[in-house]
């Protein structure tokens, strides 16, 4: 591990990340403070830690935008959030949320990508028929958006080396390295005027 860190050996970390899996990468990154505010007394960004849930959320927004701008579904709707609160949203977002809550590519068993695509296309077609959307071009684009929401091996490998959707602040990285060299003890950082 020391040599891999010293040499910045991506291949070592690709393999380590692949073996760990994204859920463990997320768990350990959070333990080291990645993707969250550090507690400094100045305003700061929390950075961003790429996760399966965030990838689906990003695709939900993208699909909502496509439904509103290209398919042409306008207006507002009320959705109920996971915590039970109601929220006013674009109707297109409510439809996208419905699509992504009912169609989860990871739950299907399939022998080929085309088999998975066809299965999702059928479900998209059924849901969008409720909104009078029957144009194959629209249905195919929405199906592809859902296909693209799958977390795949390359996402895990990218996450393992801090690439992809990850974004950290310099203070998060300094705090991470400090924790690493101090045997995993994470301290809250603070600013000093003079050393």
Where are the regions a protein language model picked out?
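Beta-lactam-recognizing serine transpeptidase/beta-lactamase-like catalytic domain environment
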Residues: 1-195
């Amino acid at each position: 591990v020391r040599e891999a860190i010293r040499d910045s050996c991506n291949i070592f970390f690709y393999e380590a990340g692949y073996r760990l899996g994204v859920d463990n990468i997320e768990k350990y990154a959070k333990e080291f403070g990645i993707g969250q505010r550090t507690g400094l007394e100045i305003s700061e960004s929390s950075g961003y830690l790429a996760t399966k849930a965030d990838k689906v959320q990003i695709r939900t927004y993208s699909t909502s935008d496509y439904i509103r701008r290209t398919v042409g579904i306008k207006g507002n709707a009320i959705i109920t959030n996971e915590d039970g609160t109601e929220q006013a949203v674009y109707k297109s977002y409510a439809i996208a949320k419905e699509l992504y809550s009912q169609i989860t590519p990871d739950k299907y068993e399939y022998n080929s990508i085309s088999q998975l695509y066809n299965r999702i296309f059928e479900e998209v077609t059924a849901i969008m028929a409720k909104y009078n959307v029957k144009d194959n071009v629209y249905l195919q684009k929405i199906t592809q958006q859902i296909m693209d929401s799958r977390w795949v091996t390359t996402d895990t490998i990218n996450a393992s080396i801090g690439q992809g959707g990850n974004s950290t602040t310099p203070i998060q990285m300094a705090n991470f390295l400090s924790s690493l060299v101090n045997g995993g003890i994470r301290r809250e950082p603070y600013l000093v005027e003079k050393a």
